[in-house]
Amino acid sequence: VGTESISLSTGTEKNQTYASAAAVNSKGIVPNNKYNRYNFTVRNTTTFLDDKMTLDFGASYILQNDQNMTNQGTYNNPLVGAYLFPRSNDWSDISMYERYDAARKIYTQYWPVGDEGMVMQNPYWINYRNLRQNKKDRYMLNAGLSYKILDWLTVSGRVRLDNSNNDYTEKF
């Protein structure tokens, strides 16, 4: 896992600005598994009209790419087969997770253990043949404007936009 971040904050009495960028890059302990996330944020707050009006706006962008994140439950989860793999068996036997079936003219999954009523599959097959990729793009924008009419009365308005796009691919 690698995490990197940088931020910048600057300002005066009437104007403050903040910007940051961060990245998380990791490869899981499950083979062929990875997660990458990048965050970018900027925010500015300023006052004017003798400090009676305040304008605050910000923007964030998040890009996330992941591959073969472990499914929950028993279906398509490599951990189920790994946990229930008989101790008397040898892992090197199943690391060659596919065999060529001449009659069908395709490679088929090699999993001599069976499914034990739990839809178990060879963990290597799941990680190298049942590929899942996910790409998420998200951006958020916000702005606020307030005006101090009297010392005890302020009028304010805010707007926020949150938009995301998710592109998910699963290959069997």
Model segments located where?
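Outer-membrane beta-barrel channels and translocator barrels
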Residues: 12-13, 49-51, 148-150
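An active-site-proximal structural segment forming one wall of the substrate-binding cleft
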Residues: 153
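Outer-membrane beta-barrel architecture
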Residues: 7-9, 20, 43-45, 142-144, ...
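Surface-exposed loop/interface segments of Gram-negative outer-membrane beta-barrel transport/assembly proteins
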Residues: 1, 29-33, 39, 43-138, ...
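Short strand-turn segments of transmembrane beta-barrel domains in outer membranes
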Residues: 1-7, 17-33
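Non-cytosolic beta-sheet module surface loops
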Residues: 9-10, 22, 160-161
